[in-house]
């Protein structure tokens, strides 16, 4: 996640300069990566945040880099990968609608871009011996403050199109509004799949409303791992709860995480990775972030997960201030 407040036409050069520094640390071949422009970090002045997943031990002996023929490429030479298969896990890096030179494809056509991206995701999975049915987690980063000519916002349209590629029960889905890497891009999607295990679709009727359609699970359990979809403060009629109150929404969000985990016989103490997406109107979101941390401390006093907090431009419905998803291990 990185911050760049300049013009879209200058964003690519900014990313390339930033990436030259990152290349000092990446191996070759490098990881599958997702890079999106966010509105900010928890504190003013912070410009970049990087998180990662690493596997070691015997799994390193079974690593397979996935670089399908026909995939898009970046605007500069980088050792990044489209995907990795490590044991029974497939990590799909952020996919965009671009060509071999990193030029945006399908500019002005959200449906084309969305379908291109799912085609790229499918290619990575296919080359890794997996399919869309194996996806447990899906992250949709869409162009904020954008609507189709019909008036439908981008998030809703993308999720509608996503129905073409999944059967029920679908993966755990999290969506939020950002800016993108190259001018003309409308979205970026990454995914994780686990092959050879029957997943447990987690659905709780006690959560209230949600922006994800019924196709998608509240969470997905596979073996000893549980992936919880993005949770927000929506009532059963999909109205915003605790309007204008980041603390109040965070309390609701964390209660929802706990309910989904309980459905898989887990507790908040089992969370190993927590992602928090924050919306705020001020210069920064320090006050909102501190309120969210207070809500977390009250909700899960004995839990100490790795946490990534990011300020995004928007969440799937106006008025939502907090979204959280997580990974838990038994």
Segments (PLM) and residue ranges:
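N-terminal presequence-like segments and the immediate start of the first folded domain
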Residues: 3-136, 142-255, 259-272, 278-330
């Amino acid at each position: 996640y990185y911050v760049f407040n300049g013009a879209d036409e200058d964003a690519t050069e900014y990313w390339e300069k930033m990436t030259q520094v990152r290349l000092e640390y990446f191996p070759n071949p490098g990881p599958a990566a997702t890079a999106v422009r966010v509105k900010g970090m928890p504190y003013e002045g912070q410009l970049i945040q990087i998180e990662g997943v690493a596997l070691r031990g015997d799994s390193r002996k079974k690593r397979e880099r996935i670089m399908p023929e026909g995939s898009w490429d970046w605007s500069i030479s980088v050792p990044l990968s489209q995907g990795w298969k490590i044991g029974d896990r497939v990590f799909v890096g952020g996919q965009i609608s671009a060509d071999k030179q990193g030029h945006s494809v399908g500019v002005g056509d959200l449906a084309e871009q969305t379908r291109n991206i799912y085609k790229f995701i499918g290619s990575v999975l296919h080359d890794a011996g997996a399919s869309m049915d194996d996806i447990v987690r899906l992250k949709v980063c869409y162009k904020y403050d954008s609507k189709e000519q019909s008036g439908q916002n981008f998030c809703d349209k993308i999720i509608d199109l996503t129905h073409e590629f999944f059967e029920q029960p679908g993966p755990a889905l999290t969506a939020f509004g950002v800016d993108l890497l190259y001018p003309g891009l409308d979205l970026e999607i990454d995914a994780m799949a686990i092959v050879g295990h029957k997943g447990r679709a987690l659905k709780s009727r006690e959560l209230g409303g949600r922006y994800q359609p019924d196709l998608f699970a509240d969470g997905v359990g596979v073996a000893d791992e549980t992936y919880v979809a993005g949770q927000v403060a929506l009532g059963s009629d999909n109205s915003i709860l605790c309007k204008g109150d980041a603390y109040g929404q965070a309390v609701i969000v964390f209660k929802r995480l706990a309910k989904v985990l309980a459905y898989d016989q887990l507790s908040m103490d089992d969370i190993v990775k927590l992602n928090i997406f924050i919306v705020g109107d001020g210069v920064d979101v320090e006050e909102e972030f501190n309120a969210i941390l207070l809500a977390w401390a009250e909700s899960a006093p004995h839990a100490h997960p790795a946490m990534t907090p990011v300020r995004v431009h928007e969440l799937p419905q106006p008025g939502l201030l907090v979204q959280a998803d997580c990974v838990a291990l038994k």
